[in-house]
C-alpha cells in the first residue's frame, strides 16, 4: 500500500518512472528475449527528456522615476514589461493625477504578474514577476530616508 502511495505521489509530481511500461511494450512487440540495447536506449531517452535547465542569466536593473504627468505611466509600464524594477516618486503630483497613475501601473503590474508596493508615503516600487521585494528591504529604505526627495 505504501508503494502505491509513493508511486501516485511520484506520478503527480511528474517523477513517475514509466520505464517498466516501455520495456514491456518493446518485449511484446518483438516477441524475443530481452534486448538490452533497446532497453538502454529507451532508458536514456526517458532520462534525457526530463532534464530542464533552471539557470537564467537575467540581471536586475532599477530605474528611479519622478513622473510629472499621467502620460508617463505608459513609459513606466514599458520598463516593467522589459523586466526592470522601477521606484516611483509621486510626491510632486496632484493627488488625483497620482491616483490615476498608480491605478494604471497597478493594473499593468497585475496583468504582467508583477507587484506594486508602497515604500513610504508617495514612493512606490514596481517590480516584475521574477523579483520579490521583502518587507525588510521596504522598512530599511523607509527608515533611512534614502528616497527623501524634496
From Swiss-Prot:
Gene Ontology biological-process annotations: division septum assembly; FtsZ-dependent cytokinesis
Gene3D superfamilies: SepF-like protein
Keywords: Cell cycle, Cell division, Cytoplasm, Septation
GO cellular component, one term: cytoplasm
Matching Pfam families: SepF
Subcellular location: Cytoplasm
HAMAP family to which the protein is assigned, alphabetical: SepF
Protein task: Cell division protein that is part of the divisome complex and is recruited early to the Z-ring. Probably stimulates Z-ring formation, perhaps through the cross-linking of FtsZ protofilaments. Its function overlaps with FtsA.
Subunit architecture: Homodimer. Interacts with FtsZ.
Family to which the UniProt record says this protein belongs: Belongs to the SepF family.
Name of the protein in its database record: Cell division protein SepF
Amino acid at each position: 500500500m505504501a508503494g502505491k502511495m509513493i508511486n501516485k505521489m511520484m506520478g503527480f509530481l511528474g517523477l513517475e518512472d514509466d520505464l517498466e511500461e516501455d520495456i514491456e511494450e518493446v518485449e511484446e512487440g518483438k516477441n524475443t528475449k530481452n534486448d538490452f540495447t533497446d532497453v538502454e536506449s529507451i532508458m536514456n531517452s526517458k532520462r534525457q527528456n526530463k532534464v530542464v535547465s533552471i539557470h537564467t542569466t537575467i540581471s536586475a536593473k532599477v530605474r528611479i522615476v519622478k513622473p510629472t504627468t499621467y502620460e508617463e505611466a505608459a513609459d513606466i509600464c514599458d520598463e516593467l514589461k522589459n523586466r526592470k524594477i522601477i521606484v516611483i516618486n509621486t510626491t510632486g503630483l496632484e493627488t488625483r493625477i497620482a491616483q490615476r497613475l498608480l491605478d494604471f501601473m497597478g493594473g499593468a503590474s497585475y496583468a504582467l504578474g508583477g507587484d506594486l508596493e508602497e515604500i513610504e508615503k508617495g514612493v512606490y516600487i514596481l517590480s516584475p514577476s521574477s523579483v520579490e521585494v521583502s518587507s525588510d528591504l521596504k522598512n530599511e529604505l523607509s527608515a533611512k530616508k534614502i528616497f527623501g526627495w524634496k
